[in-house]
């Protein structure tokens, strides 16, 4: 099952000896994905490649992971050093807060590093304090945030969008207002509130998919289904592909966060099982080609 070439467009590294990550360095806190004590330890590129050794992993893209908020570009600098030494990661998505008036300067700082591709500012708003990433709703509709997002747009960078499904209409507006920005939805819309929310999530995915500049990473399914099986995640995988199409969807691991719930092999083998009836070209798109296109790797 390891023959399919894989680009993993969503993984994380952290070095707790060298860098500061508040959510890890300052102790475990309530989160959308439960108790993460098991991963609250240094996770380096050697660890990631060891976890992935049974898969035909050819490239990977690193996503920001709650690095020191006083020095967001420090994460990109550190990761570029890792890439220069080890060959991974091939793409780097950093952090910026678009509400800050000097965000353009930060973007320029990120762009000094060859593997930098874009920004993720997680926009999840939830009434459950453990699940919320922002302290107010509809931030993307504020003039300050929009002005900052224009700085990303004019630099030709991509935007990784993490949110909850009930926010998708808000971000359909954003996608339509910035049609030249490649937006990449994270974690299949991050449905973490149980099966009763499936239908609302499904409809919202179709809503967001109306914007042709939005693609979807099918990942993070363990965060809302801690004891998942390939059959329990199948409806989410199939509905995501139905909404976005084979050409705008891609599989990803979310490792090591999803290591809380399964192995690297279990994730990729589940995706392979679910797509066993797909054509060679469709599988190539989902496992490899789309990630190469959207992240320019």
UniProtKB/Swiss-Prot annotation:
Family note: Belongs to the metallo-dependent hydrolases superfamily.
SUPFAM superfamilies in the cross-refs: Metallo-dependent hydrolases (SSF51556)
A Pfam family it matches: Amidohydro_2
UniProt-listed InterPro entries: Amidohydro-rel, Metal_Hydrolase, Metallo-dep_Lactonases
Keyword annotations from UniProtKB, A to Z: Plasmid
Protein's name according to its UniProt entry: Uncharacterized protein y4mH
Molecular function per GO: hydrolase activity
Organism annotation: Sinorhizobium fredii (strain NBRC 101917 / NGR234)
Source organism, top-level taxon: Bacteria
């Amino acid at each position: 099952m390891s023959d399919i070439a894989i680009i993993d467009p969503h993984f994380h590294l952290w070095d707790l000896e060298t860098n500061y990550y508040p959510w890890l360095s300052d102790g475990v806190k309530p989160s959308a994905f439960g108790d993460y004590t098991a991963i609250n330890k240094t996770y380096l590129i050697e660890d990631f490649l060891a976890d992935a050794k049974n898969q035909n992993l050819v490239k990977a893209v690193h996503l920001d992971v709650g690095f020191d908020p006083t020095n967001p570009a420090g994460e990109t600098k550190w990761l570029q050093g890792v890439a220069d030494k080890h060959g991974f990661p091939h793409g780097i998505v950093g952090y910026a807060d678009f509400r800050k008036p000097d965000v353009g300067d930060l973007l320029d700082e990120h762009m000094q590093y060859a593997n930098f591709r874009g920004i993720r500012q997680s926009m999840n708003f939830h009434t459950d304090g453990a699940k919320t990433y922002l302290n107010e709703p509809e931030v993307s509709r504020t003039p300050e945030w929009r002005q900052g997002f224009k700085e990303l747009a004019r630099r030709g960078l991509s935007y990784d969008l993490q949110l909850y499904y009930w926010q998708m209409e808000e971000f359909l507006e954003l996608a339509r207002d910035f049609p030249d920005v490649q937006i990449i939805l994270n974690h299949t819309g991050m449905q973490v509130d149980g099966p009763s929310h499936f239908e609302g999530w499904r409809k919202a995915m179709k809503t967001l998919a109306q914007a042709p500049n939005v693609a979807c990473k099918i990942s993070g399914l363990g965060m809302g289904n801690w004891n998942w099986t390939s059959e329990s995640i199948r409806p989410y995988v199939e509905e995501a592909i139905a909404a976005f199409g084979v050409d705008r969807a891609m599989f990803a691991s979310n490792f090591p966060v999803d290591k809380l719930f399964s192995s690297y092999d279990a994730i990729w083998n589940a995706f392979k099982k679910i797509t066993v009836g797909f054509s060679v070209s469709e599988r190539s798109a989902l496992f490899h080609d789309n990630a190469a296109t959207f992240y320019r790797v």
